[in-house]
Regions:
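Structural boundary/hinge residues at secondary-structure and domain interfaces
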Residues: 40-230, 234-294, 372-420, 453-578, ...
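A conserved glycine-rich beta-strand in the N-terminal activation segment of trypsin-fold
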Residues: 311-397, 401, 649-731, 735-737
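Short cationic amphipathic helices and targeting signals
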Residues: 59-61, 227-238, 322, 328-333, ...
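Sec/Tat signal peptide C-region and signal peptidase I cleavage site
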Residues: 33-39
């Protein structure tokens, strides 16, 4: 049996592209510059972890000013409010009781920590994480990531192979007619037992066996990627003497542990590396039970050619763990040696990561109170991304999978041609991965930061303003808008790929279906497939040309109110905000879009008729697509589709709004009416510069979000309280504060305080634009403490 070549498949996670929306914010325009570090640039980050990390690091994550951030939190009125909550107070009282109870684990731990050497260790740990910490990976991490992805892809490939025949010949064992059958048995099933291996069983594998075999084959084909990734953690401390004392203590304790095992006699050593003292523990790869593991793998996967090379490689790899001090840094590392520590730029900052081009923006902002820095190198970004080369490898890999599936030889040829078309059409559209760097810092209102992405061939357009921000409703809970580059051939490319896939299935998949499945397939092809072509024509000739450009906006709001969401739910004494998601698109040709919209409505009617011809019973008798309700509003027209049969509030209706320069799709006509008329975006307005050329923009009103969520929390809590009291909830009832029991009232009071604390993060915004050949996201948030009680 032919098996697929174990290559790298294109299923990969995309590299980080910017900060998370919940932390977004904007600020002043910022342009990074290169060149040597000026004196004022060096001052803020001189001697920092970012400066001493080697310039070839694969990734970096650094946290600074953690003690200051911690002090800000625990010293806030918000934190004090949380501590006063009854549940928190009870938990603290219980902890204090356990802490002072003789013989309790907490009491024993506290007694242990009162020893002078342990107090020193605790103080050292607190100091280590107070001001500057980092973790980075050496280039070996790139190889390790590639290996992990290769193994994952081998597992996925194994799952795509199927066999029509079992591995064993079976015979049925009929039950003994004289054997008593349990009275409660509904029937007796014949038992199957294996009597012999199939003649070709040597070439057949069960799913688990096949997966193991393909993983081993992947290891054999990628021995160069089989490495121990070198990782380094660094912690800056002002307690050098305590650090040296604790290092000696670690060495003594480690010696006691290794003395119990003769194989580890030479594993523990003290070494001088990078100008510092390290205690190292080396686990010789040859001492690990690889032979035992190899036997288990061979039992599962059979004899895989080259598997011995994998074992030899594993035996040659040492695992080295070390902890030590270099100057005022506690360094911990895990890898195959300590050689990489010699690259730490303690003596020559020019050899550090901070001096490289991606960190030019950070160098320019080095005088700011930096709180965090993250970095992904271009090689690691490329390892994590899907590239055109991956699509090329996938052509061979999937073609081999087709061959392994037992399809005709022509199938492999046709599938290869189809995959090559996919590669040609979409490979040129894939981004070309580049380095990524971000950092954050304190500002007068909260946090602020930048993310710089040097990925090339991105599909975004940042040459103009995002005009559809004027059609987001003014003060939505959240909004995110992005402009994509125009790609007139994309629809035709997608249609061509889908048609090719359908043709392949028709030619090679249909003959493998049973008679009933063939009938369903033929009916689908006769009645519904032609409608797919009509849909493509409507999009190609009507909808897409009518849209102005590549802007796409997502809006979340909650201004429409209801007292009863559904007929079968009780009403609420207070109004409940309805969740209102919407999509907004720019419009260039209103008349053409309306023509395309009418064609879509007609196509929906054709689809219902086609489905009914396929199976008259699949739809309710007499069902037709509801006629939309047309309403004139300020700025345009709204078409809404009532859902009377669903029992939902009448305000919940799918709706389409068409204005002069925007189209809105929503679940509520009221929201469409608010959005269709142009109005300035007020959410986060004081922080933003959304009137500049941007590729993307987003804003979140955190306070408004929790204000909308709170009534629903109270409604659900009251519903649960009535359910507990009466055993059921009358749909005709109205839930109010009178329905709350004592437990519910206390829980809701806790929720109220927690929401007030969460609302101290008032708003977050982000702007994304192209600057200096990079996609730059600039974010800012506003944090306001609770008032003094």
């Amino acid at each position: 049996m032919r098996r697929p070549v174990t290559r790298r498949f294109p299923y990969r996670a995309a590299p980080l592209a910017g900060p998370v929306l919940a932390a977004l914010a904007l600020a002043i325009g910022f342009v990074a510059h290169g060149g040597p570090l000026r004196a004022d640039e060096k001052a803020g980050l001189a001697g920092s972890g970012v400066q001493i990390v080697p310039r070839d690091a694969a990734f970096l994550s650094a946290s600074l000013k953690l003690r200051e951030q911690y002090d800000r939190i625990v010293g806030s009125n918000a934190f004090a409010a949380l501590k006063k909550l009854p549940a928190v107070a009870r938990a603290l009282e219980s902890f204090e009781e356990q802490r002072t109870m003789p013989g309790s684990p907490f009491s024993m731990f506290e007694t242990f920590m009162e020893l002078p050497e342990n107090e020193q260790a605790a103080d050292l740990v607190q100091d280590m994480v107070a001001t500057d910490t980092f973790v980075y990976g050496e280039p070996s991490c790139v190889s390790f990531v590639k290996l992990l992805q290769t193994l994952q892809q081998a597992q996925q490939a194994a799952g795509l192979i199927w066999d029509d025949e079992p591995l064993l010949e079976l015979e049925a064992i009929e039950p003994d007619p004289e054997q008593d059958t349990p009275e409660d048995s509904v029937g007796v099933r014949a038992v199957l037992r294996p009597v012999a291996l199939r003649a070709d069983a040597a070439e057949q594998f069960a799913p688990g066996q096949r997966q193991t075999r393909m993983v081993v084959e992947a290891l054999v084909a990628n021995l160069d990627l089989l490495v121990v990734p070198d990782l380094v953690w660094g912690f800056k401390t002002a307690k050098r003497d305590v650090g040296r004392s604790q290092l000696k203590r670690v060495e003594v304790l480690a010696k006691l542990l290794v003395q119990a095992n003769p194989d580890l006699e030479n594993a523990l050593k003290r070494r001088t590396v990078a100008g510092g003292e390290f205690v190292t523990f080396t686990l010789d790869g040859g001492l690990l039970p690889w032979d035992e593991l190899a036997g288990q793998v061979e039992e599962m996967a059979g004899d895989v050619r080259g598997a011995e090379k994998v074992l030899d490689r594993l035996r040659s790899l040492d695992l080295v763990f070390a902890v030590g001090m270099v100057g005022d840094w506690v360094i911990i590392t895990l890898g195959d040696s300590l050689d990489h520590l010699e690259k730490l730029a303690f003596q020559d900052p020019a050899k550090g990561l901070l001096s490289t081009p991606p960190f030019a923006p950070l160098r320019a902002d080095a005088d700011k109170p930096i709180t965090a820095v993250s970095y992904v190198s271009e090689p690691l970004a490329e390892a994590l991304a899907t590239t055109p080369d991956d699509l090329g490898e996938a052509v061979d890999s999937f073609s081999n999978l087709v061959a392994a599936a037992g399809l005709p030889a022509a199938a492999e040829r046709d599938v290869r041609r189809w995959l090559q078309r996919v590669r040609d059409e979409f490979g040129k559209r894939l981004p070309d991965p580049g380095a990524w760097m971000s950092y954050s810092f304190f500002n007068e209102q909260g946090y602020e930061g930048y993310a710089w992405d040097w990925t090339r061939n991105l599909p975004y357009d940042g040459a103009r303003q995002l005009e559809i921000l004027r059609h987001t409703g003014g003060t939505p809970v959240a909004v995110a808008v992005q402009r994509f580059k125009s790609d007139p051939r994309l629809l035709d490319a997608v249609v061509g790929v889908v048609e090719g896939a359908w043709s392949l299935f028709t030619t090679y998949g249909r003959p493998r279906l049973d008679a009933e499945e063939v009938d369903r397939f033929d009916a689908f092809e006769e009645h519904l497939v032609p409608l797919g072509g009509k849909l493509a024509d409507v999009l190609r000739n009507g909808i897409l040309p009518a849209l102005a450009d590549g802007q796409v906006g997502l809006v979340l709001d909650a201004k429409t109110r209801t007292k009863r969401l559904h007929d079968e739910l009780p009403a609420s004494a207070e109004l409940l905000p309805l969740v209102e998601p919407a999509i907004v698109l720019p419009l260039a040709d209103r008349k053409r879009f309306l023509g395309g919209l009418n064609d879509l409505f007609a196509l929906a009617d054709e689809t219902v008729a086609a489905v009914r011809r396929m199976d008259p019973d699949v739809l309710p008798k007499g069902y037709e697509v509801p006629e939309p309700k047309k309403t004139k509003v300020e700025g345009g027209t709204v078409w809404s589709f009532p859902l009377a049969a669903a029992g939902l509030d009448d305000q919940l209706q799918p709706a389409i709004g068409v204005g002069e320069d925007a189209v809105i799709f929503s679940l509520g006509p009221q929201q469409v009416g608010r959005m269709i008329a142009a109005a300035p975006l007020e959410t986060g307005r004081r922080l933003t510069r959304f009137n500049e050329p941007l590729a993307a923009a987003a804003a979140v009103d955190v306070e408004q979000f929790f204000d909308a969520l709170a009534p629903w929390v109270r409604y659900v809590a009251r519903y649960a309280s009535v359910q507990e009291r009466d055993g059921e909830v009358d749909p005709d009832a109205e839930l109010s504060a009178d329905d709350e029991n004592e437990q519910t009232r206390e829980a809701l009071d806790h929720v109220r305080v927690v929401f007030e604390v969460l609302k101290t993060l008032k708003v977050a915004v982000v702007e994304t634009a192209f600057r200096n050949e990079a996609l730059v996201s600039h974010w800012r948030n506003v944090i306001r403490d609770l008032p003094q009680p």
